[in-house]
Amino acid sequence: MSRIGYKVIELPAGVEVSQAGEVVTVKGPKGTLTRNIASDITMTVEGNEVKFTRPSDDYKMKALHGTTRANVNNMVEGVTKGFTKNLQLVGVGYRAQLQGKKLVLSVGYSHPVEFATPENLTVEVPDNTHINISGIGKQAVGDFAAEVRAVRSPEPYKGKGIRYVDEYVRRKEGKTGK
């Protein structure tokens, strides 16, 4: 089932991967990431390659094998390139702005919605209808972007709301009169 787990991770120049028990640490030009991995999965670092092996072929081990490899690969990609999510505000009067370390959204509520920017992320507002969230942790970037989007997710009739730039919003037709 899991063929992803058997793929070898090639380490780019300047990236180090180390393991202490169940904790994997990846150091690279953009920073350092640590993560716990499953104790049953064995990770070996040989030169500039990282390989993963599993003890058995039961369903749970196959799932953990592929997931562990994907998580470590995302860590390697994060410390070399980083991850970015771009959001777009669609709607009359919908605006975003940065006030110090806070992201402030005006999205049709009676009050502005404020978010404290997490320490490990960079939030940019190039214009008042776009938000760029970037960082080295794929999960942290995705979680914060989803949290911002959940404030006013796109509705299907007019498409108003906060959406990812590459997201397709399925539209519905309104009621027809008699």
UniProtKB/Swiss-Prot annotation:
Keywords: Ribonucleoprotein, Ribosomal protein, RNA-binding, rRNA-binding. PROSITE patterns: RIBOSOMAL_L6_1 (PS00525). One of its GO terms (cellular component) is cytosolic large ribosomal subunit. One of its GO terms (molecular function) is structural constituent of ribosome. One of its GO terms (biological process) is cytoplasmic translation. Disulfide bonds: none annotated. Pfam families: Ribosomal_L6. InterPro entries: Ribosomal_uL6-like (IPR000702), Ribosomal_uL6-like_a/b-dom_sf (IPR036789), Ribosomal_uL6_a/b-dom (IPR020040), Ribosomal_uL6_bac-type (IPR019906), Ribosomal_uL6_CS (IPR002358). Belongs to the universal ribosomal protein uL6 family. NCBIfam families: L6_bact. Part of the 50S ribosomal subunit. This protein binds to the 23S rRNA, and is important in its secondary structure. It is located near the subunit interface in the base of the L7/L12 stalk, and near the tRNA binding site of the peptidyltransferase center. This is Large ribosomal subunit protein uL6. It comes from Lactiplantibacillus plantarum (strain ATCC BAA-793 / NCIMB 8826 / WCFS1). The lineage of its organism: Bacteria, Bacillati, Bacillota, Bacilli, Lactobacillales.
